[in-house]
Amino acid sequence: MAGHSKWANIKHKKARVDEKRGKLFSKLSKEIIVAAKEGGGDPEKNFRLRMAVQKAKENNMPNDNIERAIKKGTGELKGFNYEEISYEGYGPGGVAIFLDAMTDNKNRTASEVRHIFTKNDGNLGEDGCVAWMFDRKGLITIDKEQAENIDEEELMLLTAEAGAEDFKSDNNSIEIVTTPQDFEQVREALENEEVPLSYKEVTMIPSNTVKVEGEEAKKVLQLMEELEDHDDVQNVYANFDIDDSLMETG
């Protein structure tokens, strides 16, 4: 399984909901605000907003919070003016890390992100230093334990007809890759067949991975945790290849 989707699944399982929910709702609200500001407040006409609202609902964010965030984005309600910014750098072992942030103070966020990199044996780089190693794609994974009696050939045909670019299967999971434009159509095709999806995001997929082990791997995971935990950081992507068992415990 791709490192990022595996990381996301494990992070979801390990999260202590009561502690994380407030921070998660804040990040989901930011995405809705920026999406509505960028493309208008109607999810039917704004793909990015539609995806943000769906993700918020999947995480049990109250409808009142969602509506309030949309109105802040369209200007109906007063709110912060968030700016989108990306940061790039390297973690221990030469792992490439790319992250998206939304902030009302770029200088503060840059300083704090740099500090997190430095204290975890990484370094924040210049714009473009690792972006070329990633492609923005739709990524859907299916946990085979949750999808018993699945016919993989039929599934491959279904996703190909819906526009999927790639279909990979191993002992534990199925991974489907799409363009960002075809992601929603492929996801809906699977959901219409009631296929349980363990991960479904438009994400950044690395073109190659870096194997890290032992203490170095633990340092990479610690860096990932701290970056993801920062209030202004929305998404963190990396090209590490770390053993599943270490990610489960690390």
From Swiss-Prot:
Pfam families: TACO1_YebC_N, Transcrip_reg. It is found in: Cytoplasm. Its main location: cytoplasm. Keywords: Cytoplasm, DNA-binding, Transcription, Transcription regulation. GO terms for cellular component: cytosol. Gene3D superfamilies: 1.10.10.200, 3.30.70.980. GO terms for molecular function: DNA binding. GO terms for biological process: regulation of DNA-templated transcription. Transmembrane segments: none annotated. The keyword Coiled coil does not apply. InterPro entries: Integrase-like_N (IPR017856), TACO1_YebC-like_2nd/3rd_dom (IPR048300), TACO1_YebC_N (IPR049083), Transcrip_reg_TACO1-like (IPR002876), Transcrip_reg_TACO1-like_dom3 (IPR026564), YebC-like (IPR029072). HAMAP family: Transcrip_reg_TACO1 (MF_00693). Belongs to the TACO1 family. This is Probable transcriptional regulatory protein Nther_1800. It comes from Natranaerobius thermophilus (strain ATCC BAA-1301 / DSM 18059 / JW/NM-WN-LF).
